[in-house]
Amino acid sequence: YRGEAMQITTYLEHAARHELSANVIDLCPVGALTNRPYAFEARPWELKKTLSIDVSDALGANIRLDSRGREVLRILPRVNDDVNEEWLSDKARFMVDGLTKRRLDKPWLRRDGKLEAASWEEAFAAVARINPGSSVAVVAGDMLDCETMFAGKKLANALGSSLLEGRQTGLAYDCTNLAAVNFNTGLAGIETADVLLIVGSHVRWEAAVLNPRLRKAAKNGAKVFVVGPEWETTYPATFLGDDLAVLNKLPKDVTEALKAAQRPALIAGGAALR
C-alpha cells in the first residue's frame, strides 16, 4: 500500500552483481535510478553527443559519447538490433572513469627497483641515454591510437630496433581466411541456434552483451556445451573440461547433439588459440 510514511530504499539483502546491471539506469522511467559517476556533473543540453563504437570487447556495441569540452562525461548505448540491441555492458558504460580520473597521465621511471612518477623531460632524457640496438623493445597498449603507435615505431627505428608488439596476449591471428574468424552467422542469428559449443571463452566477461542472446537460445531449447574453465552461466550448460584435447574425443551425447543439429554454432575465444 501507499502512504505518507512509505519510503523507497535499496534492497540491501542482495546486491546487483552482474555485468549488465547498469542497464537499469536506461530502463528507469522516472530517472530515480541514476548513473552515479555522472550525477550532478552536467546538464544534458550542455553535452556534445558523438556516435561511436565500444572498443572494450570484440562485439562492437553501438554507443553514444556525451562530452563537454575535451572531457567525456558519460557513455550510453545506441539501439542496433543486429549487434547490442539496446544493451551495454557495465565495463563499457563506466570505462569513462578511466578517461579522466584513473589514468596514467605522466611517465613513470623505474629507479632503484621502484616505479616513480617523472616529468616528460626526465622520461625523454632516459630514452636518449638508451644504447641503440636490437635490445630495445616497444610495446603498445590495447587502446592506443594509430598516431601514437606510429610515433613509437619511428622511435624504435631511430634506436635501431625492430622489436614492436601491440598484442598483449602475444597471440598471432591468421586473417588470410576471414570467414574462419568472423562471427559469420550474425550476432542476432545466435538466438536461433539449437546447439552451442563454446570453446575457450568466458562469454559473460569477454562479450557481456552476447550472453543474453545465448540465454535466449537456451530458453528456446538449445543445448549448450563449454570447453574451458568453469564459470557461472545464466543458463543450463554442460562443461566438458578445460583441456582442448576434449575436442578430439567428445562425449557421445555431444556428438549426437551436434550431428542432429540443424543450426549448430561454435564460439571460440582467445584462450582457445593459446
Please identify what each model-predicted range represents.
Residues 1-8, 170-173:
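Short, conserved phosphate-binding/catalytic loop or strand-edge motifs used
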Residues 5-9, 23-27:
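C-type cytochrome heme c attachment motif
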Residues 14-17, 21, 25, 32-274:
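Catalytic alpha/large subunits of respiratory electron-transfer oxidoreductases
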